[in-house]
Amino acid sequence: MTEVFTADTTIDRSVDVVWARLIDRDSATRWMPGVDALRAQDPTEIGTTLIFTTRGKERTGQIAALNPGRSITLRSVQGGVTAGYVYTCSGYGDRTPVRLLADCSMTGPVRLLSPLIRSAIRRADSGQLDAFAATFTRE
């Protein structure tokens, strides 16, 4: 997979509070651009399928890796594009650094469009952590 972007922020809350919001599916629409709904029928664990609605269409992703309280990796495959989003929390008292690493790979004819697709992903999602941090200031 090729890195698309990395984003970092620090939130003035404990890692437990930040982590709880990060994995709260109901709050995802507040900070994931273009996501109108996010649901899953299973608990937050490796292999859980996530169903999200974006631009009027249902799509699926999966929890590919999980270190509770520390990191979660969401992976989705749409056509020949596989995207991975790794969210990492590092707790230090009442301040929690959070990092998002987005990467993707492409197969088949869509590979010809890889620079455009990576640019679109970067443009759409590189502000996720700023939006996520803002959910704490709106409390």
How does the language model describe each region?
Residues 1-39:
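Hydrophobic ligand-binding cavity/cleft-lining segments
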Residues 38-46:
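A solvent-exposed, acidic/Ser-Thr-rich amphipathic alpha-helical stretch
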Residues 77-127, 134, 138:
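Beta-strand/loop substructures that line and gate deep hydrophobic ligand-binding cavities in soluble
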